[in-house]
Regions:
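Acidic catalytic loop of the alpha/beta-hydrolase fold
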Residues: 35-36, 75-85, 113-114
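C-terminal catalytic histidine-bearing segment of alpha/beta-hydrolase fold enzymes
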Residues: 72, 88-130
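Periplasmic peptidoglycan-binding/anchoring modules of Gram-negative envelope and division proteins
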Residues: 54, 59-64
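Extracellular/periplasmic catalytic domains that process cell-envelope and extracellular macromolecules
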Residues: 20-22, 62-65
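Primarily recognizes the serine-hydrolase "nucleophile elbow" in alpha/beta-hydrolase
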Residues: 1-42, 53-54
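Short, flexible loop segments at the rims of nucleotide/cofactor-binding pockets, characterized by
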Residues: 46-52
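Short alpha-helix in the alpha/beta-hydrolase fold that links the catalytic acid
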Residues: 58, 67, 81-96
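Short beta-strand/loop motif that positions the catalytic acidic residue
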Residues: 65, 70-75
């Protein structure tokens, strides 16, 4: 999820390989971190559980004009700590800057470890419809 979001929002990563992030039909991250990834925080010796929003945070790179971004998370009461809230923040920031192509789906009854299977049905349906 995190990698899909950072590639979608910060075009420099795909441009380095001659690709345009805006040519991707859609981004469909499942339970992705929208703040700086915990691995980066760990490498920096920062405490776990405290979000960092810096140049490595997809939410800090939200753009107005993107392909569709379909955020999929598990149930906010069952997901990893703050994961649904991070995605809700991402969707809110996108909306506030005028990006109408970001949507958030919360899959009730599923947690971080069980959300992928039902998320695949959403992804398949999206592909079939578009």
């Amino acid at each position: 999820g995190y990698l899909a979001l950072i590639l979608a929002m910060d075009k420099k990563y795909m441009e380095a390989y001659g690709a345009d992030a805006d040519k991707v039909a859609a981004y469909l991250p499942v339970s992705g971190q929208t703040v700086t990834h915990f691995t980066i925080r760990k490498e920096r010796g920062l405490p776990n559980g405290i979000p960092i929003i810096d140049e490595y945070a997809p939410v800090n790179r939200v753009r107005k004009d993107t392909p569709p971004v379909i955020l999929i998370t598990g149930d906010r009461n069952l997901e990893m700590a703050d994961r649904w809230e991070e995605n809700a923040l991402f969707a809110s920031v996108a909306k506030n800057i005028g990006n109408k192509k970001v949507t958030l789906h919360e899959l009730q009854g599923f947690n971080h470890g069980t959300v992928l299977e039902p998320a695949c049905f959403l992804i398949i349906n999206y592909i079939r419809e578009h």
